[in-house]
Amino acid sequence: TDVADRPEFADRRTTREIDGQRLTGWFTEDFTWSELSTLRARERLPQVRGASTRFDGRYPLVRLRDLLGMLAEAAPAPSGVPVRLVAEVKHATYFASIGLPLDELLAAELAPWAAAHPGRLVVEAFEQTVLGQLQQRGLPAEYVYLLEKAGSPADLVARYGRAALSYAGHLTTAGLARLRAAGIDGISVDTALLVKAAPKETDRPGSAWHSIGGGLAASDLVDRAHAAGLGVYTWTLRPENRFLPAPCRVGSTGAAHGDWHSWFGALMRTGLDGVFADHPDLALEVRAAL
């Protein structure tokens, strides 16, 4: 947003530790909605997506309740399938520590919409604790656990410190079974956990990675997750070179589009159930060509 250019909010700039990281900037919890509603959106990556900056300053922020209203009026997709909502819960442990229980707030906001639109709500988070809390509150949704390629979930680190189970520990066959037994419906993972530039151990006996051509290799994660009864999603499909593995880059300019078609296709051919893409039109183009 343009908050850094707003002198009336200059004194709100501060430094906080959130999920083990010290961050300096402006934080939503220090603003009222009336104040936030005066801000205007900006392109997050202007050096990469300069064309998008022409929209800077034109549009206000959208609240969740406003988005729910838009979805209630949205026409079905061309396939006839109603548009679904994926709500990602961020930094739940941190917000709970400052008296903002996101499970309570989200359940109050989402429950009426979810009840009126069955089967259209997906809730995801990097912290399993808040997913369980929302389940206990009876929010009807598909629950998806987000997993990074490294590190450990913030809720478990807050509870167990260095003994916290890592994301990798959740992705073992036993870990996937535990997630399903806990009521998790699916996992959503970094693309690098599904496809990447072929590592040295590709195709070796016992390796989780197998060559798929083009200098890329795919893991066995989708098959193992499906065997455990979990859906599989990945994030984020982007066409620019800086976001592509080396075999799919074209030229040396990070902002230029590389061989995104091969990259998107390689991910989709793993058999996963859905993708998150910054350019949905490009993702649909690749899906149609499979």
Features from the language model and the residues they span:
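Metal-dependent phosphodiesterase/phospholipase catalytic core, i.e.
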Residues: 1-151, 155, 161-165, 175-176, ...
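C-terminal active-site rim and adjoining tail of enzyme catalytic domains
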Residues: 96, 137, 142-290
